[in-house]
């Protein structure tokens, strides 16, 4: 079946079925390492010298070459705060002006806190608008982790997680780990936000509602405020811990030990290389 026919079938099916039941538990497959030269292209913003308030010394003092190279893709409704999340983390400031994203990549580095090793992150921003539905899957190949985002001040964006975003990423990246991220947490208790939603018979999304949806996705759940820089570092530290742990598990389970049986450490530093996201 050709790629175009396959995609047509998916989009036709996604309109009929708004909810997809998670598949049986499958250990996420580890992606292959990618060099920065492969990652960097036109439109990529390199942020190795990030001035993030929480990461200044870490980002500027990293001198060792990356031990890991990971790709994170961010999806969610347009205007829910995806770009602000990536810019706040990688560049250390909150963009006040909203400019819709088509595709944008950010390259930055951080430390895996347990091991102290350097991790290079390629952060892929995507467009949430419907007119880009057929272009967005181009971002998915070789993804190590997915951030599925919604805005806490917009209950409809959480509904769309199960109606649109989870089915889409499950289709294209069935074994890639997911973190559900509640954005704009600073608006939950803001009076103007509460009053505006009240006129529509709505309330801001509660932590319990976010946790419930994450449970249906078999995903981790975190919240943050990019504007206040609250919880942003925790979002990415959880992501880094997740993908590094998966790679270490792959070393233990997929490579032979000195006795020739599975379960050994990497031999000569070599790792099994696999892709977990692809366009069929």
UniProtKB/Swiss-Prot annotation:
What are the binding positions for GTP in this chain?
76-83, 125-129, 183-186
Give its localization.
Cell membrane
The principal location of this protein is: membrane
User: Where are the bilayer-spanning segments?
Assistant: none
GO CC terms: cell cortex; cytosol; division septum; plasma membrane
| Comp. bias (Polar residues) | 33-59
**UniProt membrane topology term:** Lipid-anchor
Query: Which residue ranges does the record annotate as region Disordered?
Result: 13-59, 251-275
Q: Which domain of life is it from?
A: Eukaryota
The family classification in the record reads:
Belongs to the small GTPase superfamily. Rho family.
Official protein name in the record: GTP-binding protein rhoC
Q: Which organism is it from?
A: Emericella nidulans (strain FGSC A4 / ATCC 38163 / CBS 112.46 / NRRL 194 / M139)
Q: What is the lineage of its organism?
A: Eukaryota, Fungi, Dikarya, Ascomycota, Pezizomycotina
């Amino acid at each position: 079946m050709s790629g175009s026919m396959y995609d047509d079938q998916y989009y036709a099916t996604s309109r009929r079925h708004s909810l997809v039941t998670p598949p049986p538990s499958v250990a996420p497959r580890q992606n292959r390492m990618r060099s920065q030269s492969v990652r960097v292209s036109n439109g990529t913003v390199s942020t190795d010298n990030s001035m993030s308030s929480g990461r200044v010394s870490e980002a500027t003092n990293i001198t060792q070459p990356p031990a890991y190279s990971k790709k994170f893709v961010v999806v969610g409704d347009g205007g829910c705060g995806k770009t602000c999340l990536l810019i706040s983390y990688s560049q250390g400031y909150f963009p006040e002006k909203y400019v819709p994203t088509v595709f944008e990549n950010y390259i930055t580095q951080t430390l895996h806190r347990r091991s102290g090793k350097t991790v290079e992150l390629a952060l892929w921003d995507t467009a949430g608008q419907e007119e880009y539905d057929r272009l967005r899957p181009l971002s998915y190949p070789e993804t190590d982790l997915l951030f599925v985002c919604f805005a806490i001040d917009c209950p409809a964006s959480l509904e769309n997680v199960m109606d649109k975003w989870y089915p889409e990423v499950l289709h294209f990246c069935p074994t890639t780990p997911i973190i559900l991220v509640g954005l704009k947490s600073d608006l939950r208790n803001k009076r103007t936000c509460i009053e505006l939603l009240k006129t529509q018979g709505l309330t801001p999304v509660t932590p319990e509602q976010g946790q419930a949806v994450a449970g249906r996705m078999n995903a981790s759940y975190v919240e943050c405020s990019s504007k206040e820089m609250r919880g942003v570092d925790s979002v990415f530290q959880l992501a880094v811990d997740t993908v590094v742990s998966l790679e270490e598990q792959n070393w233990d389970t997929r490579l032979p030990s000195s006795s020739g049986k599975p379960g050994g450490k990497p031999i000569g530093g070599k790792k099994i290389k696999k892709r977990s996201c692809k366009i069929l």
